[in-house]
Each structure stands twice: as structure tokens, then as C-alpha cells.
Amino acid sequence: MNVQIEESWKQHLAPEFEKDYFIKLTEFVRSEYQTTTIYPPGRFIFIAFNLCPFDKVKVVIIGQDPYHGPGQAHGLCFSVNDGVPFPPSLQNIFKEIQSDLGAPIPTSGNLTRWANQGVLLLNATLTVRAHQAGSHQRRGWEEFTDAAIRILAEQRENIVFILWGSYAQKKGAFIDRNKHLVLASAHPSPLSAYNGFFGNKHFSRTNEYLQAHGQTPIEW
């Protein structure tokens, strides 16, 4: 199957594209886009991979689902398009960056600038029906994104994996802590941010680790 995804990822994920689950997933997603409103727009489904080639990945942040409101989702977890008000979790992420690094709250919630520096902003599920949170879960996306994380963790070294909340922590449970830095805390959602997200210093800790391993820090 010829999947429109960045070439280095295409090579590493090629076996997945031929598996039954992925063929069924593709048929389901194609049908959904033809019959109802799906986010993100189709050209952005694999944008997290397209902006962040396999060998350029320094950091992985794992999300769960794309935003399901109009104009929000554009294929990067937690990120929104320019001009879109910050969802609560993203607002809290920026507050923690401000507290941790002294950086001002940005004017845009578009995290493409992170992706361009090597931050893979990966949702576990890459599509969703408008206004129906979780509507494309358990259709095969989770298996596909598990494979992407597993291949990265096995074939690369010294990546920072950031796991916020129990869902992301379960998804990243197999990552070898001897080869990579795994940072885990509560989710930035208002429901849990005060239970361990605020004050986690994940952004400064990420940069310290990258610099200790000869890499350029991220401009958060």
C-alpha cells in the first residue's frame, strides 16, 4: 500500500502498511472522510511524521485523540491552528513552560515550531469524527502508533519520551529506560494538572538531557 508519509518513516513502517489491521483501518478512515466530517483534514493525518523524520526525532510527546471541534486539529497532539483559542490542556502546558523556563506564553498554540525541532507530537489515534471524542478509537490507529513508538525506541537512542497521564504511560510502558529518558506525570488537563503536572519541569529536564547527549535543546 502506498501511504503518503515521509520517506524515512515509510521505510521503517512499511511492514505495518501490509498488515490486515492497517488495510481495514484505511478502508474505514476513507469511508468516514467520504460520509461525515472528520478531523484533522485528510492531508494532515500523518503531519507529525512528515515534519519530524525518523532520524531527526529528539523528543516524543504522546497524546490520545485529535481535537474534535471545528478548526482545531491539524495533526499534532495538543496543538491548534494559528488564531484558535488555546484548549485548557495546552494553556496549562504553556503555563508550565513559563514557570519552568521563564518563557512568555506564546500568541499561537500552533506547535509546528516544536515539530520542526525534532519533537514528534503523536496522538495514539490520528483521526476523529466531528464532536465525537474517541470515535475512531479501537479501529487500528493505536496498533499503528504503538509500532511507530516501538521502532523508534528499539532503533534509536537517547530520545526523551514525555508521557502525561495514565493513557500515555500505558502506551509507553515498554520503552527501555536504559536507552532513553522517560518523563511521566499527571496530564495537563484541568482535572489533573494540580496533581503533578504543574511543577514537573519536563521541559527543562528534556533540554538538560539533550544537551548532556550532545544535542541542541528545544526552544519551547
Name each model feature, range by range:
Residues F197:
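C-terminal substrate-binding/active-site "lid" region of AdoMet-derived donor-dependent transferases
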Residues M1-L13:
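Generic N-terminal amphipathic, Lys/Arg-enriched alpha-helix
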Residues V3, P15-V160, A168-K170, I175, ...:
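A polyanion-binding, active-site-adjacent surface
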